[in-house]
Amino acid sequence: MEFFTYRLPNGIRGIHRQVKSNVAHCALVINAGSRDEHPDQYGLAHLTEHAFFKGTQRRRAWQVNCRLENLGGELNAYTTKEDTTLHATVLRGDFAKAVELLADVAFRSTFPERELEREREVIFDEINTYKDSPADRIYDDFEDLLFAGSALGHNILGTKAALARYRSEHIHAFVRRTHTTDQMVFSSIGNIAPRRIEAIAARYFADMPATVRSFCRTAPAPVAPFERNIARHTHQSHCIVGARAYGILDPKRLPLALLVNILGGPSANSMLNVTVREKHGLSYSIEGSYTPYGDAGIVAIDFSSDHDNCDRCLELVRGQIDSLRTRRLSTRRLALAKKQFVAQLAISMESNEGYMLGAGKSYLVHSEVDTMEEVYRKISDLQAGELLEVANEVLASPSLLVYR
């Protein structure tokens, strides 16, 4: 059995994979992120994630932070536009302690004002660091333009002015509205029997009252393609070419993921790396990405170059996109691309922690998780015509943002 799944009486779902390892990983994946903020709450989901570590009804902040660290383990969290994830890594024998701590911070955090004052300063520094990184900032600016007017069209970090307004009661209200038990998955991996996992999860999570989300997310409205140049006075030009794409439930997401990997994946033989970097020497770093959300997605190609080379890079990028839109991949080239993609996925799954987090997200969204064999079969079945189709549907009229 690849995965063991279960459901607690309060609606929290669980998924576990038993593997041979002395280390165990677990996570509470919550279907709540920055897109669930009201317009006057931007940055609140991320602040909430930080505030989870600042004290509970049972523990002070230092006790939360030291509970697993003293055991050689780790407690961490992250926020995306759609999810908040609390996760822990410990030795197998300390697994129950990790679960108890996750339950404590997820359901009994008090968000004390004195701790929030200090943590705001930490996030202010995070915002400053982000502003000093044009490669990070341009992606968020591009996404804001691409999803303008929607809940996906704002930065996760928020602004200093907004963060300065938030108090403990704002976080409590946000958690009550968005962190409902029907929107949670407890994911785990380690050398622990499935029924033992379910018993531990029930011990620490099942006494939490069942709650149900009372709102629905709104899909982003269409946005016309755009081209923007912004003066940032950076040492290099930074550029993104991209477009709206399929959401995570769309069956076309898999051929699109393969297409983006061929065009600008991490390998040295991706089309853009070969053309822009290796053949012409115009950019040190150029890559493509595909990020699917629940009801939409984004494909983006980003690079940096000397100011004088930016237009030539754009010309080459557009040429490679046009090639994928007008020429069907040969049988041999498609077979090699699929083999490469499968191998990359297999290597990435060697990380038990990454595998656990991915399984939790997949189970949250799809209520099932494909085995790696099923994923490999789906990739193997892809046809050149499918890639040609998605290239024309997604990349026919890409948008552009340039920092100069």
Task: Walk through the language-model features, giving the residues of each.
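Short, conserved beta-strand segments within well-ordered enzyme catalytic domains
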Residues: I15, H25-V29, F52, N76-Y78, ...
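Active/ligand-binding-proximal structured segments within catalytic/core domains
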Residues: Q18-L68, P251-G264, M271-V276
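N- or domain-start disorder-to-order transition segments that initiate the globular core
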Residues: M1-V23
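Charge-rich, well-structured scaffold segments of protease-associated domains
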Residues: V64-R213, A219, N229, Y246-G247, ...
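His/Glu-based metal-binding/catalytic segments typifying zinc-dependent metallopeptidases
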Residues: Q18-K20, A27-V29, V212-N269, Y403
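Generic preference for hydrophobic
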Residues: G14-H16, L28, F186, V241, ...
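Broad gene-expression machinery/nucleic-acid interaction feature
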Residues: F3, V23-H25, D83-T85, Q183, ...
